[in-house]
Regions:
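A short, polar beta-strand/turn micro-motif
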Residues: 84-116, 137-212, 216-264
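C-terminal outer-membrane/trafficking sorting elements
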Residues: 126-127, 260-315
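Extracellular/surface-exposed low-complexity segments
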Residues: 59-91
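Structural signature of tandem-repeat unit edges
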Residues: 6-22, 31-50, 62-73
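Consensus positions within tandem repeat domains that build extended binding/scaffold surfaces
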Residues: 1-3, 22-29, 52-58
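Structural motif
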Residues: 40-42, 66-72, 106-107, 154, ...
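Short linear interaction motifs
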Residues: 127-137
């Protein structure tokens, strides 16, 4: 199919369905510059391997195979993949411009430096406070199969229109840390993971692009939680919240275990807002949005942080 396509460097076959393929001749043979092949759930490497003509599937091609977390082991153990010695990694598509997101996958990783891309830190949700409207994040050092997480990505200086591919998360699987998991480990967790796309549960909370968890309408039938991601369920009052439960209309922000906020709300000892300041003279050089990011061109009518206070820009 792609025999001797010398100019190919990356190939997206995430929507390719191999179920009806009856013959496959030297699929990626002599694609010498091909570095990455992205495969979807309906791309069966083992199925193609059973076709006699697939014997040269990866001849003279050293591309890394990126597959969905659910099909990782099937792809890794494919006879042709083993024979060719292809590297295999799971990948998850994400919103490339969001600083925070959620992740829940059926395979594990020890997250050794240099073994993962698309995020820089991983957290578990360990508590929620109804009165403060916050959830607490505790840093995780590895990916445990089936456990839901919040990830952070350092995006300062990223050129989203350039060659930087920030639209996927990928990592090396640690076989020793990956048990056989067929369902998320949601028992006792405020953050609930899902391996498949699902309609968001009414009354739950979804992490949105502003870095906060927003409530889902009780009668929701359209808003979805994506595959290999997670949502916040505060229906139980056993952890935080008190006897009165949680306010379903409230937006919940994230704070780290040490009390530091992920957003703009830095609090002084006297309870006043410190805001985000230039460390040289404690004066802001520019406007900041509500996530603490510098804004080069403030928009009229939008809310920003100036001198530690929220203001509406009216110029």
């Amino acid at each position: 199919m792609f025999l001797s396509c010398m100019s190919l460097t990356s190939l997206d076959l995430s929507n390719f369905d191999t179920q009806l393929v009856t013959q496959s001749t030297s699929l990626f043979f002599k694609c010498q510059k091909l570095e990455a092949i992205y495969l979807g759930d309906k791309f069966s490497l083992e199925g193609l391997s059973k076709l006699y003509a697939s014997v040269n599937m990866f001849g003279n091609c050293s591309a890394t195979l990126y597959c969905s977390p659910a099909t990782y082991w099937a792809s890794k153990n494919c006879s042709r993949v083993k024979e060719a010695g292809q590297a295999v990694k799971p990948y998850v598509s994400i919103n490339k411009t969001s600083e925070y997101g959620t992740l829940c996958v059926p395979v594990g990783s020890s997250l050794v430096a240099g073994s993962f891309t698309g995020f820089d830190k991983l957290y578990q949700v360990t508590n929620a406070d109804k009165n403060k409207g916050t959830i607490t994040l505790t840093e995780a050092k590895s990916i445990e199969p089936g456990v839901p997480y919040v990830y952070h990505r350092y995006l300062e200086g990223v050129d989203f229109e350039g060659k930087n591919d920030m639209s996927v998360i990928t990592f090396e699987v640690d076989a020793a840390a990956s048990s056989s998991v067929t369902a998320p480990k949601n028992d006792g967790s405020l953050l609930k993971g899902t391996f498949e796309s699902m309609v968001a549960k009414g009354g739950s909370y979804i992490l949105q692009t502003d870095g906060n968890f927003h409530p889902v309408a009780a009668d929701n039938t359209t808003l979805k939680v994506g595959a290999y991601s997670a949502y916040l369920d505060l229906s139980s009052t056993e952890i935080g919240g008190g006897d009165d439960g949680f306010d379903e209309a409230k937006v919940y922000s994230m704070v780290f275990e040490n009390g530091e906020s992920t957003g703009i709300d830095r609090i002084n000892g006297d309870g006043s807002y410190k805001g985000i300041y230039d460390q040289a003279n404690l004066q802001p050089k520019v406007y900041f949005d509500l996530m603490g990011r510098k804004v080069a061109a403030p928009q009229k009518g939008e809310i920003y942080i100036v001198n530690g206070k929220k203001v509406v820009y009216n110029k």
